[in-house]
Structure formats: structure tokens, C-alpha cells
């Protein structure tokens, strides 16, 4: 009722879709989801956000059985090729075997695209920018902006793990990509503190 009054839009159960975006910024809104299910089940409600695992760490309990979760992941190499209209190449890669390898020119093309994918990563905005013909530099700027926004969000969820610890471990993982992760050099902290920060980053899908 209050939302209807604020936005001057009627909310009609069964017809209106209520969308809570960036819900990770409001712990109270996350807590309210279970009550919508229990007290207002006829209303269609969708919530979206990033680093939700960080926010959920702040809650004593979450609406188990009352909230259905859907996870969105970065692009896979297959999806990257499809976005670049290289479905034929992906089909050829799938059919290739050690006995029936790709022809050298096709193999070189696949490796070039793989290298670009490894540089760009799989974030949708970055891939969309690349597909639209933007330069690699433009794509890297978007990646920098995404990293900054993630780090800004770290500060909102620091009850369990200090923000500085999460940032240190996050930076260490990025700087040592492709190398074995060594706890001793990850941050100025003990094993337990580093593991807590790393576990949180893994749960958030920022580290795999």
C-alpha cells in the first residue's frame, strides 16, 4: 500500500510484478521476502542483487523454502563464442578429438578467441561492449569500474569479516591469477581470517 502511494501506481495481486533491484543494499528488504510469501503469496515478487551472500551473512536466518533462488553466472567460453556469432566454430570444437583435430587455421582462430575471452572475462557488460565493436581498452575500463563497485560493496558487509581483509584477499587473488593461492602472502592476517574472507568471496562467486 505504501509503495502504491509513493509511486502512484496500483499494485494488483496476480497482475502486478513487484521488482526489488539491488536488494543487497537493504537487509530489511531481504528479510521481508519470507513474509511476502507467508502473508501475501498472491503477489508476484522478484528481487535481484549482487554479492547477496555477503548480505545474507548479516541475517540470522533466511526464508528457507519460501524464497526460490536463481543464480546468474559470467559467460562461459561457449556463450562468448555464441555472442560473437561463432556458433559454427563452437560446433567444430565440440566435434574435435585427438584423432580428428581441428585444422591449423581453425585451431589458431579458436586460440585467439580463447585468449581474448581469458582477458575479457565473462561479465555481460564487458562482453556486450566487445561484441558492439568497442576496443579492448574500453572493455578493460568497464572491468575496472566493476571491480571498484564490488570493493565499494565490501564495506557494507563487514560484521563478520573486516572490509580491509576482504579487499586484501580479493586483490591477492586477482594479482596471482593462474598461480597456486598461498595463504601466507594473501594478506596481513592469520590463516583463519584469510580463510573467512576467501570463503566469503567464493560464496559470492567472485573467486572460483
Predicted regions and their residues:
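Structural recognition of the conserved hydrophobic beta-strand(s) that form the central parallel beta-sheet
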Residues: 19, 44-50, 71, 80
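Conserved P-loop NTPase "ATPase switch" module shared by AAA+ and STAND
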Residues: 11-29
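Conserved AAA+ ATPase core "coupling" helix
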Residues: 73-95
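Conserved catalytic/switch belt of AAA+ P-loop NTPases
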Residues: 30-47, 51-53
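Interdomain hinge/linker elements that couple catalytic modules in large macromolecular machines
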Residues: 87-208
Amino acid at each position: 500500500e505504501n509503495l502504491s502511494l509513493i509511486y502512484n501506481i496500483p499494485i494488483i495481486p496476480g497482475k502486478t510484478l513487484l521488482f526489488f533491484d539491488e536488494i543487497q543494499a537493504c537487509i530489511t528488504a531481504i528479510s521481508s521476502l519470507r513474509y511476502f510469501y507467508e502473508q501475501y503469496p498472491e503477489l508476484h515478487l522478484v528481487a535481484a542483487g549482487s554479492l547477496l551472500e555477503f548480505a545474507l551473512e548479516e541475517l540470522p536466518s533466511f526464508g528457507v523454502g519460501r524464497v526460490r533462488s536463481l543464480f546468474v553466472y559470467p559467460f562461459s567460453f561457449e556463450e562468448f563464442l555464441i555472442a560473437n556469432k561463432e556458433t559454427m566454430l563452437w560446433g567444430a570444437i565440440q566435434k574435435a578429438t585427438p584423432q580428428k583435430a581441428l585444422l591449423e587455421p581453425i585451431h589458431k582462430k579458436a586460440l585467439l578467441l580463447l585468449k581474448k575471452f581469458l582477458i575479457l572475462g565473462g561479465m555481460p557488460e564487458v562482453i556486450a561492449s566487445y561484441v558492439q565493436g568497442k576496443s579492448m581498452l574500453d572493455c578493460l575500463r568497464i572491468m575496472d569500474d566493476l571491480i571498484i563497485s564490488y570493493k565499494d560493496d565490501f564495506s557494507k558487509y563487514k560484521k563478520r569479516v573486516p572490509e580491509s581483509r576482504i579487499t586484501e584477499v580479493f586483490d591477492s587473488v586477482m594479482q596471482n591469477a593462474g598461480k597456486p593461492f598461498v595463504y601466507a602472502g594473501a594478506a596481513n592476517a592469520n590463516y583463519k581470517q584469510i580463510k573467512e574472507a576467501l570463503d566469503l568471496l567464493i560464496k559470492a562467486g567472485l573467486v572460483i
